[in-house]
Each structure stands twice: as C-alpha cells, then as structure tokens.
Amino acid sequence: MAYDSKHTELLEPKEGYNLTEKEYKKYWTHLNSFYSLSFHRFVPRERENYRILDLGAGDGRMYPQLKGLEPEEYVACDCAEKLLAQHPGRIKKVVCDLEKDRPFEDQSFNLLSAFFLLEHIEDLDHFFAESYRVLSDRGQILIGHFLQKRLFMRNVQAKRFKIVQYPHTIEEIEKAAQEA
C-alpha cells in the first residue's frame, strides 16, 4: 500500500475492487458504449462445445453480451472475490490472480474476454503467454481497452483511494500479444 497524493491510498486491484463491491456499478457510466456491442461478428458462426473464460469478470458487467454467444460453458475469473460474488447467473466463478499462472488446463477455452483489465496487469508478456496456454488452437482473445490519463478516485466506507494501473499503450499490448 502506498500514497500517490495527500490522504489518497494507492491500492492493489484485489483490495480496491473488493472495497467497491457494493458501489461498483455506479462507476460503469464511462463504459456504457461497450454494453451495446454485439460480439457475434467477432466469433465463428459454428460454436459447438464453445467455452468462454471471462478474465477480470468482476460483477459481470460484460456477461449479457458474452451469454448472448450461447456458450456451452462460461467461466468468470477475477482476483476480487467480493466483487465476483456479485456476478449474476449460475455460473462457474474462479478467484485467481491474473499476474500468476491460471488454474485451468491447456487449450480449454475457445474465447477469452478481457475487458477493462489490461490496465491492471503489470506483466503483459506473462498475461498473454498464459492466455495462449489455456486457449484452444483456433481460439480468440477479445480485448476491450481504453486509455486514460489519470486514475479514478474512489471514496468508499470513508476511505479515499485509487487502484493501481499500468498505462500500457496499444502498441505495447500488440507487441506483447504477438511475441508471447
């Protein structure tokens, strides 16, 4: 834990997002344009035995769009167990640190989604290496990323904080994805 300005704590994603579990949805407004997307045009038409791993799934903000792909299995994965507990639906929920190896078998998913996640990943090389490991041969990674100049301030339970972020450029993300 560190301070990046007077009386503002800088928290790791797990701690910060667990604190925001009940108020997280009010922070969604700047992301609303993503919620009207249809992912059908990005994935194969034939999706037999289709398995989706939603990385950084949080409270399920992207679940309606991913559920619309009618996967055989959808798995939500996040480091913040309290936020993940808010995720709707009767689905498999896995708490894991995406900076480490993932608790999934090799080539076990057809689609990995990572929306608004990469800014919380320090080691992109490891992130993509692990993503490719659990991805099937013809699998895809669907990434939603936005660039922001400053961290969002959060005030929860009389605690003022920001969540650690790493300002990766699109070029850095592309390079890490290609070299993994």
Please name every model-derived segment.
Residues 101-106:
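Short conserved loop adjoining the S-adenosyl-L-methionine
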Residues 165-180:
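Short alpha-helix
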Residues 113:
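A conserved beta-strand element that flanks and buttresses the S-adenosyl-L-methionine
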